[in-house]
Amino acid sequence: MDISKMDRYAAPVHFSSLPLLATVLCGVGLLLLAAFTMLQVTSTKYNRNVFKELFIAATSSIFLGFGSVFLLLWVGIYV
């Protein structure tokens, strides 16, 4: 296996778009986290909807997770 004949690896996301992706994904995740917190504080135990809570929490978790990955890539920690 000759390394010089292999194709060079190209990242699926261009490095110049990492700051925008990190900022947008973390921002959306934090907004959903705030919405989830407001939902928990303002609802009583009689009008809570567990599916709505799980949907908002899972969506926020996904956005914050991907935002954290892009943030780490942006600062040079290649995970």
UniProtKB/Swiss-Prot annotation:
GO terms for cellular component: cytoplasm; endoplasmic reticulum membrane; membrane; oligosaccharyltransferase complex. Its main location: membrane. It is a multi-pass membrane protein. Keywords: Membrane, Transmembrane, Transmembrane helix. It comes from the Eukaryota. GO terms for biological process: protein glycosylation; response to endoplasmic reticulum stress. The chain crosses the membrane at residues 18-38, 55-75. Pfam families: Ost5. It is found in: Membrane. GO terms for molecular function: oligosaccharyltransferase complex binding. Pathway: Protein modification; protein glycosylation. InterPro entries: TMEM258/Ost5 (IPR007915). Belongs to the OST5 family. Component of the oligosaccharyltransferase (OST) complex. Subunit of the oligosaccharyl transferase (OST) complex that catalyzes the initial transfer of a defined glycan (Glc(3)Man(9)GlcNAc(2) in eukaryotes) from the lipid carrier dolichol-pyrophosphate to an asparagine residue within an Asn-X-Ser/Thr consensus motif in nascent polypeptide chains, the first step in protein N-glycosylation. N-glycosylation occurs cotranslationally and the complex associates with the Sec61 complex at the channel-forming translocon complex that mediates protein translocation across the endoplasmic reticulum (ER). All subunits are required for a maximal enzyme activity. This is Dolichyl-diphosphooligosaccharide--protein glycosyltransferase subunit TMEM258. The gene is tmem-258.
